[in-house]
Structure formats: structure tokens, C-alpha cells
């Protein structure tokens, strides 16, 4: 009964990567704006940024 893995479209990934390039820690209003623009839950966006920062640390 685990939840399904979220699969993001290339457009969604591009938009999130673009924000990440400017700000690795977007605040809730920025995440909400992204969420409504991309049609994703804000919580999913929060998790994506958390994981993206972890990925960045692993690459360093």
C-alpha cells in the first residue's frame, strides 16, 4: 500500500530546475505558485526540492 512514485513531465522538471537554479530554498508562496502553474501538489514540490538539494550534495 505504498504510494505511487510521482513521475514529472519534462516541462515540470524544466520549470522546477529553473527555479532551483535561482533559489534552492523557495518559500511556501513560491512553491504554491509553482504548484498551481504546474498542476502539482505543493507538498510534492517541497519534496522535489529536498531531494534535489540532496542530489546536489551527492554530486559535490
From Swiss-Prot:
Q: Which GO terms describe its cellular component?
A: nucleus
Name one molecular function that GO assigns to this entry: RNA polymerase II cis-regulatory region sequence-specific DNA binding
Location in or out of the cell = Nucleus
Q: What protein is this chain from?
A: Homeobox protein EgHBX4
Regarding protein family, the annotation reads:
Belongs to the paired homeobox family. Bicoid subfamily.
The gene name reads HBX4
**Pfam families (alphabetical):** Homeodomain (PF00046)
Matching entries from SMART domains are given as:
HOX (SM00389)
Q: Which residues bind DNA?
A: 1-60
Main localization category: nucleus
The record ties this protein, via InterPro entries, to:
HD, HD_metazoa, Homeobox_CS, Homeodomain-like_sf, HTH_motif
Q: Which UniProt keywords apply?
A: Developmental protein, DNA-binding, Homeobox, Nucleus
PROSITE patterns recorded = HOMEOBOX_1, HOMEOBOX_2
Residues forming coiled coils = none
Amino acid at each position: 500500500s505504498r504510494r505511487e512514485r510521482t513521475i514529472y513531465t519534462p516541462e515540470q522538471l524544466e520549470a522546477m530546475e529553473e527555479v532551483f537554479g535561482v533559489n534552492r530554498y523557495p518559500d511556501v508562496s513560491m512553491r504554491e505558485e509553482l504548484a498551481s502553474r504546474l498542476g502539482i501538489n505543493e507538498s510534492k514540490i517541497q519534496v522535489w526540492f529536498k531531494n534535489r538539494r540532496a542530489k546536489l550534495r551527492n554530486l559535490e
